Amino acid sequence: MSTSAPAALRKTALNAVHRRLGAKMVDFGGWDMPVEYSGLIAEHMAVRTGVGLFDVSHMGDIQLRGPGSLDAVQHICMNDASKLAVGQAHYSAMLYPQGTFVDDVIVHKFSDNDYLIVINAGTREKDYEWIRSHAQPFHCHVSNYSDLYTQLAIQGPRAAETLAKLTSVDLAAIKNYRFTWGTVCNLHNTLIARTGYTGEDGFEIYIPSDEATSERVWNEVLEAGKEFGIVPCGLGARNTLRLESAMALYGHEISQDIDVFEAGLDRYCKLDKGTFVGSEALKQVVAQGGPKRKLVGLEMIDRGIARDGYRVLNDTQQAVGYVTSGSPAPFLKKNIALAYVPTELATLDREVFVEIRNNPVKARIVPTPFYRRPKKQA
């Protein structure tokens, strides 16, 4: 059986490395990506207890430069970028006029006239066109640098110790959602951001996307983290890690059919900053008393795994909602899920049912995130 990737799928610069490591490869949003190497549970636990290394080069990078770049970002994204300091990033989202999601993003402020928006892999082309078209009225230049960088995520409680071996940058000075430039693995002007999608401490670094450089840095990170039990990690562990941390995934918890209040992401939506795409529709949601449904966390009481799309039933066995993501939680050793239910049912400790193979299986609504990383000891 051939192990070569289908020609139609896009590849990161590390594709051959993943295959040599024996990774199980899958089609993820049109990309040939590793879903697991040694196994999902081992990779998940390495990130929770030590350190893991992810290739996340399929993510997109859109830069806005010019005197109108802040105004453009403010118009396109729901968070308030005027509050960002140089060297700071924040979580945000781009919305359709009806207040539903184009995509969720991370916005980085390079300078007063220079911003980077990191977008999701499966929506790269759509997102770029959305940003480009909506930035047109503003005095800024939009550039798609998605293919110029290999993006590596070094995640876990030993991530800082691992990366510290490869750079002279004072990593302790880079607080959560902050970034700087420095030399990593002898590569100058490397972007080093204290960000991630795992619920753990960690860093994402951006390096040139040529295969030789990408492979060298990948191998040097693995060598640096060897004493901490580092393992290469695939998208499977990335998904269970983000689910334990109740982080949204586009196409599941957020989509063009789900609005900000339903998703519970209104803390990142600054309606008081002025008008932006989607703001008027969201003000109407507020005026009408809030959303009709809400995203909740579920913990299975009875045996069973709630999967994406499974129906949520009320106490009279009527379908009232649906599961957006569900899985065994390797670190928590529980079966968990995220689901949409009517607002009147979205109360903690309420028991509901998830329909699994035509059988109602009992679950409880619980607080999210399911997992919070331990606070560092003084």
UniProtKB/Swiss-Prot annotation:
Catalysed transformations (reactions): N(6)-[(R)-S(8)-aminomethyldihydrolipoyl]-L-lysyl-[protein] + (6S)-5,6,7,8-tetrahydrofolate = N(6)-[(R)-dihydrolipoyl]-L-lysyl-[protein] + (6R)-5,10-methylene-5,6,7,8-tetrahydrofolate + NH4(+)
GO biological process entries: glycine decarboxylation via glycine cleavage system
Enzyme Commission (EC) number: 2.1.2.10
Quaternary state and interactors: The glycine cleavage system is composed of four proteins: P, T, L and H.
Coiled-coil stretches noted in the UniProt entry, renumbered to this chain: none
Keyword line: Aminotransferase, Transferase
Short name of one Pfam family: GCV_T
Enzyme type, top EC level: transferase
Task of the protein: The glycine cleavage system catalyzes the degradation of glycine.
Organism: Acidobacterium capsulatum (strain ATCC 51196 / DSM 11244 / BCRC 80197 / JCM 7670 / NBRC 15755 / NCIMB 13165 / 161)
Domain of life of the organism encoding this protein: Bacteria
InterPro entries cross-referenced by the UniProt entry: GCS_T (IPR006223), GCS_T_bac (IPR022903), GCST_C (IPR013977), GCV_T_N (IPR006222), GcvT/YgfZ/DmdA (IPR028896), GcvT/YgfZ_C (IPR029043), TrmE/GcvT_dom1 (IPR027266)
PANTHER family (alphabetical): AMINOMETHYLTRANSFERASE, AMINOMETHYLTRANSFERASE, MITOCHONDRIAL
Protein name in UniProt: Aminomethyltransferase
Family in the record: Belongs to the GcvT family.
GO molecular function, one term: transaminase activity
Lineage summary: Bacteria, Pseudomonadati, Acidobacteriota, Terriglobia, Terriglobales
GO cellular component: cytosol; glycine cleavage complex
